[in-house]
Amino acid sequence: MGERITLSVIKADIGGFVGHSSVHPRLLETAERYLAESKLLIDYRVAHVGDDIDLIMTHKYGVDCPEIHHLAWNVFLQCTEVARELKLYGAGQDLLSDAFSGNVKGMGPGVAEMEFEERKSEPIIVFAADKTEPGAWNLPLYKMFADPFNTIGLVIDPKMHQGFRFEVYDLIKNERVEFSLPEELYDLLVFIGAPGRYCIKSVYSKTTGEIAAVSSTQRLNLMAGRYVGKDDPVCIVRCQSGLPAVGEALEPFANPHLVAGWMRGSHIGPLMPVGLDQSAPTRFDGPPRVVAMGFQLSGGRLVGPQDFFGDVAFDKARQTANEIASYLRSLGPFEPHRLPLEDMEYTTMPEVMAKLKNRFVKVDHRDDREPAAEELGAK
């Protein structure tokens, strides 16, 4: 076996510039400088989508490595100091603890990591989204790895024809379950069609057993017990040679699907694929955005990124997303633009409702009954 490489993508919202729209250049410079000093990494890139900083790192220490997670945590702490100096909005909001405990999972930042033996050619895509939640990856990952109308390789590539194994997390019960596709396709859809609770964590090739994709599944609100911003997930997808081609991995985003998040994390909106220079959400703090950064790995070195969604081929998707956004905005505070009440539990909505609870009185349904015939006659 050859040497195994670990690709870690760890993200956090450290403070918005301006509001929730983007990241101040000084924060990116701080992250770059801190990672450059580390002896742990083979290579790294610092990116952002909206107001989230994404640390893309390669190393040889495997997933859940305490030293790598501590490095990312320290980067975010350094950036938080700069954010507070600049009085950026929500400085350090994704950091839910004051002390590092060996792993950033459960402490606020989102994490997607995979370890694999680098192939002869290793194309990967790092997807990063803003103003939405981890379930936003469910439909795209399903289409990439299970839908032959999206991925023709499932039909004609003998290395893909056997299908893929999906690992799904229940974010409420903290449980996981695996499905073997295509034979358990309908069973999978029972769960991933509810992306607020069930999220695709990882995908594995049934032909090779190798990992093909992994996503961050951290839910900030569930960890903090209050609304502290949307989760803004990341996802890593390996491509080609028995896995979806790059174009097959990008194709699901050509037709924007609806995701939860947007303004105050309380609305449904289209996930708009954008170039890196268009990733600052502004209209109603949105619509939700997704970027796609393509890399070739070479001995763990990151060659790239290629800004995939900057292509004019996605102009139509952006136009469609804007049209969907305009229609949904016309509904204002009404569902289905606003999230249903059960999904508003961790927003500020309960505080407003609590103020009014004493104004509710019981309804006597006997007063609502139809009058009997004799009562009508008496009148």
UniProtKB/Swiss-Prot annotation:
Active site: residue positions: D13 (proton acceptor), Y227 (proton donor/acceptor), K230 (schiff-base intermediate with dhap)
Residues binding Mg(2+) 4, per UniProt: D231
List of residues binding dihydroxyacetone phosphate: H20, K131, R264, D285
GO molecular function, one term: fructose 1,6-bisphosphate 1-phosphatase activity
Pathway: Carbohydrate biosynthesis; gluconeogenesis
Cofactors required: Mg(2+)
Family: Belongs to the FBP aldolase/phosphatase family.
PANTHER family linked to this entry: FRUCTOSE-1,6-BISPHOSPHATE ALDOLASE/PHOSPHATASE, FRUCTOSE-1,6-BISPHOSPHATE ALDOLASE_PHOSPHATASE
Reported function: Catalyzes two subsequent steps in gluconeogenesis: the aldol condensation of dihydroxyacetone phosphate (DHAP) and glyceraldehyde-3-phosphate (GA3P) to fructose-1,6-bisphosphate (FBP), and the dephosphorylation of FBP to fructose-6-phosphate (F6P).
NCBIfam families, sorted: FBP_aldo_phos
Record note on quaternary structure: Homooctamer; dimer of tetramers.
Protein name per the record: Fructose-1,6-bisphosphate aldolase/phosphatase
Gene: fbp
